[in-house]
Amino acid sequence: MRDLTEYVCKAMDMLDSIGIKYGNIIDCTVNTRAQKRWGQCRKVPGGYTININAVLLDEQNSEDGLMNTILHELAHSVDGCMNHGANWKAVASRIYSAYGYEIKRTDSAEDKGVIESTRQIEYKYQFRCEKCGKVIGRTRASKFTRNPKWFTHRGCGGHFQKI
């Protein structure tokens, strides 16, 4: 497993070299539980904490995906950038211009260079389209999980059945 602290320091040096003033990073942690997000930046008294999905630290996965995520979260610590608004986009654009990391609001596992076998999501609910057979999963209860017949599959127009 890669050393998160080493990569965070490298990302901070990159931002320092292009004059981006990020906030006081109090702590960086590895999140072993998150299944749907790559990272998170939280404002806490005295600064910010950043946590990064453990999957990104796996040696099998792309180093670029890890750096991209760390830079994304550090960008949130810049004044006025906690959301994905114009200020955050301007910071992301500066990072892209300097280093080529395309920092976006969302990324797929493929975009991050994550091998799917290293990222297993445990679905509490699974459904199959009656028309095309596609299986989809959901981790939380919702209108869809309670009444799948009310919804149609965008791909083929079929209805879902719980499996």
Model-derived features: where do they sit?
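Walker B catalytic acidic pair
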Residues: E73
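Active-site-proximal or metal-binding-adjacent scaffold patches in catalytic folds
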Residues: M1-N68, S77-I163
